[in-house]
Each structure stands twice: as structure tokens, then as C-alpha cells.
A protein has these predicted regions:
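Surface-exposed acidic, glycine-flexible loop patches that form ligand/cofactor-binding
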Residues: 23-24, 58-61, 113-118, 143
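An active-site-proximal "capping" alpha-helix that borders the catalytic cofactor pocket
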Residues: 47-70
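Von Willebrand factor
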Residues: 75-124, 130-136, 155-165
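Hydrophobic beta-strand segments of well-ordered beta-sheets in folded domains
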Residues: 29-33, 65-69, 119-127, 148-157
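Mature extracellular/periplasmic domains of secretome proteins
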Residues: 139-146
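Acidic, polar low-complexity linker/tail segments
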Residues: 1-32, 37-47, 63
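Active-site-proximal, acidic helix/loop segment immediately C-terminal to a metal-coordinating Asp/Glu
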Residues: 43-44, 134-138
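P/S/T/G-enriched low-complexity
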Residues: 163-179
Length: 179
């Protein structure tokens, strides 16, 4: 469950992304939510519902949203579906969710987002600790110039519940690989 600090961090991070020059100019917001299927069903359902409730209570922008849900099962299998924000808030979209093992890299995720979700003005990623990066150059090419600025990652177990922008995650995973 998201505590008050995590909710405030989410609201602040989303405001920063939406107010990047040239990103969101009003109207219907198109956004993407990526779920790492290595996470437990209980965590995903609860966090996604909290996320939707927090955003909806924060701003009128989230009253009418085109929401793309991406289930990141493994590098070779990413499932896309369009759902309503209310459906996410009630966690109904996770009734058939199954936790899955498999290799998940930022390489595959960033390539998929660049191809299919570049129009989204906001990309939220619920990620597990097992997310890795194989080719930093390829990830950088996929994240630049826009994906890195409009994507926010929340890693399960993040101590302060802070959301990291995509370009910061890219640097973090590169440092982790060097160790």
C-alpha cells in the first residue's frame, strides 16, 4: 500500500513529467502503465489501485485517460491492452494476472515502448529488482530524446517510494552492471 510520502512523490514526479515543454498540452491524456510480471499479484493489484486513486484525486487530467496496460512477462513477451482508469482503480484487470519468471531487460522494454507507446505523455513502470540492462548504448538510443523524460519507474522495495525518471534508471542500471 502506498503511504502518504509515496503518494506525494508520485504526484510531484507526474507533475514534472507532464510539464516538460512540449509534452502535454491538454485534452485527453494518453498514458502507459507497465507491470513487471515478476511481481506478486497482491502487490500489483494494490499498488496499481493506489496509483490510480492517487492520480485521480490529484488532478482533473486523470478523469479522462486513455490507459495502455503493458504486462511485461519476459523479454520476448509483452502484452498490450487498453483499459479504463476505473478498471485499474478497482483492480479488475488483474483477475487473471499470474506471476511469471523470466528474463526482463530494460533493452526489450525500451524498444517496445519506443515502437508502440511513444505517443504516451506519461509512462509509469512498476518494476521488480530483477530488471537488468544488456546493451547500454541501445537502451540510450531507445530512451533518447523523449522516453527517458516521460517515463517513471517505481522499484518494488524502494525505501522511500521515490519514482525515478527513465534516464536516471538507465544510469542506475549501468552502474549496477559495472559492479
Amino acid at each position: 500500500m502506498m503511504n502518504l510520502i509515496m503518494k506525494e512523490n508520485l504526484n510531484n514526479a507526474v507533475e514534472q513529467v507532464l510539464h516538460v515543454k512540449g509534452n502535454y498540452a491538454g485534452g485527453i491524456l494518453e498514458m502507459t502503465l507497465v507491470i513487471d510480471c515478476g511481481l506478486t499479484k497482491a502487490y500489483v493489484a494494490e499498488t496499481a489501485a493506489d496509483l490510480a486513486a492517487t492520480l485521480r484525486s490529484h488532478s482533473e487530467v486523470f478523469r479522462n485517460v486513455r490507459l495502455n496496460l503493458v504486462l511485461f512477462k519476459c523479454d520476448e513477451r509483452l502484452e498490450n491492452q487498453v483499459i479504463s482508469f476505473s478498471f485499474l482503480q478497482m483492480s479488475s484487470c488483474f483477475e487473471e494476472y499470474q506471476e511469471q519468471q523470466g528474463k526482463r531487460t530494460l533493452d526489450a522494454l525500451s524498444a517496445n515502448l519506443k515502437l508502440f507507446h511513444a505517443r504516451s505523455k506519461l509512462i509509469l513502470v512498476l518494476a521488480g529488482e530483477s530488471l537488468t540492462m544488456e546493451d547500454p548504448q541501445k537502451v540510450h538510443e531507445n530512451m533518447a530524446p523523449f522516453l527517458g523524460k516521460k517515463s517513471l519507474f517505481l522499484f518494488q522495495g524502494a525505501i522511500n517510494g521515490s519514482w525515478l525518471r527513465g534516464d536516471a534508471v538507465e544510469r542506475l542500471l549501468a552502474q549496477r552492471e559495472e559492479l
